[in-house]
């Protein structure tokens, strides 16, 4: 078959508005960079690649990898609002109760399992010592998704450092039906209000607190990121209804590449922050930029040409996206456990400090491989079966 005719035929097809396959690639990219950052914190492996005698350094990307959490929050806004955006093309919506049931069925069992495992390990290793008050605070705050509201349960928790993002997501879920309804009725006003509140919140945090660590990731400071994800979903559905052709695909491919290049430049700027407080301030100052570029990437890639779409949507990215929640929850803990257990042998007591290159490479590979394997086992052996069981039980009870 003529490849040019195939490309032209593909270019004229309207994008899917139910499952945006390129979103899998953007999610996989974001979560792998975040994981690389956390694993790099333990391995100290300098991230470079030598091609044809020329060395390419990924140090700025990895050193600022934490900033890609913003893209993960953006994707949540995009995916959650997509069904609401499809209401404009006649699709039936869902009630707030149905929304809460689906979100809880997917997230809450895995969240509780993580807490149970982490709490068991903490007790077995006497991580709390005699501090029963902190033990209770840590446990209760995590069970109620409020661990971000106190410094010790946020930063000194024994229940997994990644769970704060699930707490933030759960807070967003609580508000989402109201935000979605307002966004659908008054999109410009709701978008402006969410972005404005986020900007004012971050400006106030920066001006009022010498140490912003407890405040810069709170819900109000993330509202613009979430709003941009919702706006991207609305734009995608509207754009998908337009006539597509080679020119549209080429323009969107160019915007995709430009967005990725600008995200790289943003990461380089963030990597130049010299201390912890500068890092947090830099993250707040670049949050709107990350959100705008991420939104452009989501919309443009979904409407890009065949090659760009298949780079972002392939079996590897679809797999990473499918197991992303479990991978995100467990990768940092697994990296710490492997380091403390000295699971990767080395002649040095502290191979990361000594720059044991062979150990660093083996350790990095093991962290990714074991984390992905554990994520797959938990996703397909626990997360999805439990969610199906809970939702099926709810439907059965509703039919009685």
Describe each model-derived feature in a short phrase.
Residues 66, 226, 230, 253-384:
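Alpha-helical transmembrane segments of multi-pass integral membrane proteins
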Residues 23, 66-69, 84-123, 133-141, ...:
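Transmembrane alpha-helical segments and their boundary/interface "anchor" motifs
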Residues 18-21, 57-69, 154-168, 207-228, ...:
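Interfacial loop-to-helix transition and helix-capping segments at the boundaries
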Residues 21-86, 107-111, 142-147, 151, ...:
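Functionally critical transmembrane alpha-helices in membrane proteins and complexes, commonly lining
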Residues 1-20:
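Short, Lys/Arg-rich, polar N-terminal cytosolic tail immediately upstream
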Residues 78-86, 114, 118, 172, ...:
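Hydrophobic transmembrane alpha-helices
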Residues 32-39, 120, 148, 194-206, ...:
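Aromatic-anchored segments of alpha-helical transmembrane domains
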Residues 170-198, 233-253:
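Solvent-exposed interhelical
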């Amino acid at each position: 078959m003529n490849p040019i005719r195939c490309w032209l035929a593909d270019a004229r097809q309207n994008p899917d508005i139910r499952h945006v396959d390129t979103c899998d690639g953007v999610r996989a990219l974001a979560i792998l960079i975040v994981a690389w950052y956390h694993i790099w914190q333990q391995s100290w492996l300098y991230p470079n690649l030598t091609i044809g005698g020329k060395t390419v350094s990924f140090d700025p990307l990895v050193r600022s990898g934490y900033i890609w959490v913003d893209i993960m929050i953006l994707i949540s806004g995009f995916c959650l609002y997509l069904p609401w955006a499809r209401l404009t093309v006649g699709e039936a919506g869902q009630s707030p109760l149905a929304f809460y049931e689906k979100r809880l069925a997917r997230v809450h069992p895995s969240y509780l399992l993580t807490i149970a495992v982490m709490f068991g390990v903490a007790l077995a290793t006497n991580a709390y010592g005699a501090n029963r008050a902190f033990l209770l605070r840590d446990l209760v705050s995590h069970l109620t998704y409020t661990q971000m509201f106190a410094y010790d349960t946020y930063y000194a928790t024994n229940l997994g450092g990644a769970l704060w993002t699930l707490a933030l997501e759960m807070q967003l879920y609580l508000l989402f039906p109201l935000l979605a309804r307002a966004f659908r009725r008054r999109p410009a006003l709701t978008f402006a209000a969410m972005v404005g509140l986020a900007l004012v919140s971050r400006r106030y945090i920066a001006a009022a607190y010498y140490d912003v660590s407890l405040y810069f990731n709170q819900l109000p400071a993330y509202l613009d990121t979430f709003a941009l994800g919702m706006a991207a979903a609305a734009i995608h559905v509207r754009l998908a209804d337009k006539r597509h052709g080679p020119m549209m695909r080429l323009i969107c491919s160019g915007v995709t590449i430009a967005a990725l290049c600008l995200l790289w430049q943003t990461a380089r700027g963030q990597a130049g922050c010299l201390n912890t407080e500068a890092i947090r301030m830099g993250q707040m100052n670049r949050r709107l930029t990350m959100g705008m570029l991420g939104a452009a990437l989501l919309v443009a890639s979904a409407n890009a040409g065949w090659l760009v779409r298949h780079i972002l949507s392939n079996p590897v990215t679809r797999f990473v996206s499918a197991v992303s929640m479990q991978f995100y929850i467990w990768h940092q803990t697994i990296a710490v456990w492997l380091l403390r257990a000295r699971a990767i042998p080395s002649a040095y007591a502290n191979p990361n400090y000594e720059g044991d290159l062979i150990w660093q490479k083996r350790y990095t590979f093991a962290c990714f491989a074991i984390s992905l394997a554990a994520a797959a086992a938990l996703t397909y052996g626990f997360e999805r079966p439990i969610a199906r069981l809970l939702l099926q039980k709810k439907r059965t009870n509703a039919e009685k």
